[in-house]
């Protein structure tokens, strides 16, 4: 497992990854109930309360013990920006990234940091992302090197799966 707090510096921000259990649960409730965020989360719902946040956080954090990877809390310039990382989905390490709208412009830098860890220190052979069919603006994922890899249903919701291998990664990611 990676260290619990890692910092990545670039010209614009200080990016830190921490355990989800280090975040105030009210911040997670606020993020996961944000109407703009919910539009991007087909499995999300606006009734995500404090009790659900605590249970959800424990389940996400337990993936580190069970699979050797899991999602992190993401901080940008010492502010909670969201959560993301690799989470177990149907046998795959699936990349999830949920950011507060104030931080949506930071997604690519966070993605690069996660993918680099996945293929170096974590030794992943591939990672996936799942997108709902309603997400039609997806040219960017192909530029990053993702390839179509079938479809899956999770909790009754249909997703398209895309897979990234180290050898298909775009040079802009490495």
Model-based region annotation:
Residues 28-33, 53, 57-60:
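Hydrophobic alpha-helical core bundles mediating ligand binding, dimerization, or RNAP-core interactions
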Residues 38-58:
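Conserved GNAT-fold acetyl-CoA-binding loop/helix
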Residues 8, 48-49, 57, 65, ...:
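Intrinsically disordered, low-complexity regions enriched in Ser/Pro/Gly/Gln/His and often acidic
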Residues 58-73:
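A short helix-loop-beta-strand connector motif used in the catalytic cores of GNAT acetyltransferases and
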Residues 1-40, 71-174:
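Acyl-donor (CoA/ACP) binding surface of acyl/acetyltransferases
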Residues 45-49, 70, 133:
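Short, conserved alpha-helical segments within structured domains
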């Amino acid at each position: 497992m990676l260290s619990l707090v890692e910092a990545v510096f670039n010209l614009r921000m200080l990016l830190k990854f921490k355990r989800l259990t280090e975040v105030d649960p009210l911040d997670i409730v606020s993020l996961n109930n944000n109407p703009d965020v919910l539009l991007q989360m087909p499995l999300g719902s606006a009734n995500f309360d404090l009790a659900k946040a605590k249970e959800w956080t424990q389940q996400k954090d337990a993936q580190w013990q069970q699979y050797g990877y899991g999602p992190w809390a993401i901080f940008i310039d010492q502010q909670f920006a969201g959560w993301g990382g690799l989470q177990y989905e149907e046998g795959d390490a699936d990349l999830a990234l949920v950011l507060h709208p104030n931080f949506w412009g930071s997604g690519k830098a966070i993605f690069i940091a996660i993918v680099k860890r996945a293929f170096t220190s974590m030794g992943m052979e591939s990672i996936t992302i799942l997108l709902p069919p309603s997400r039609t603006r997806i040219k960017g994922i192909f530029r990053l090197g993702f390839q179509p890899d079938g479809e899956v249903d999770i909790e009754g919701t249909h997703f398209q799966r895309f897979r990234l291998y180290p050898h298909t990664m775009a040079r802009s990611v490495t």
